[in-house]
């Protein structure tokens, strides 16, 4: 028997979700930007999904943006933030154990002249908050730490990290990749 150990990243679709997706793909497939009936129906599905996600995160619907997935979201967040804040500094902090969707755009930014600091982790995969405190400086524009590691499941102390970052440099933007945490770890964007 095959043991599937990547359930947090890719989970089998529930029957209920599958049935709804088949209905949408076969019957309610209108362009949600169109004004005709099928488009309006498709838009309603999107609004309902946005509302449900916002409720789980205690966020406002306008704060929820849909992309094709985590990689696109992380690329937009990291590259966009770094390039938009380049005049404020060129230092970015991350960890040694980030997902490729974080590591790859940071490698690109390094090639563009940004200085990247990678925090080490202990034997359990946790960062040192003291090392983070020492790393944040006046030129630090961005810190990116995943909330739950996709390979070993380590839960990082992101709420504590947020406090340290804001204490050391209130202008530093804190990016948290919470893809693995959604639905399993209790958090909201307000707790960061």
Say what each PLM segment does.
Residues 81-103, 115, 120:
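Conserved PLP-anchoring active-site segment centered on the Schiff-base-forming lysine
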Residues 188-192:
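Conserved small/polar residues in nucleotide/adenosyl-binding loops
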Residues 1-34:
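N-terminal "arm"/small-domain region of PLP-dependent enzymes with the aminotransferase-like
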Residues 20, 24, 45, 52, ...:
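Alpha-helical structural signal in soluble globular domains
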Residues 33-72, 76:
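Conserved N-terminal alpha-helix of the aminotransferase class I/II PLP-enzyme fold
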Residues 60-64, 88-90, 138-139, 171:
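Short acidic capping loops at alpha-helix termini that bridge into adjacent secondary structure
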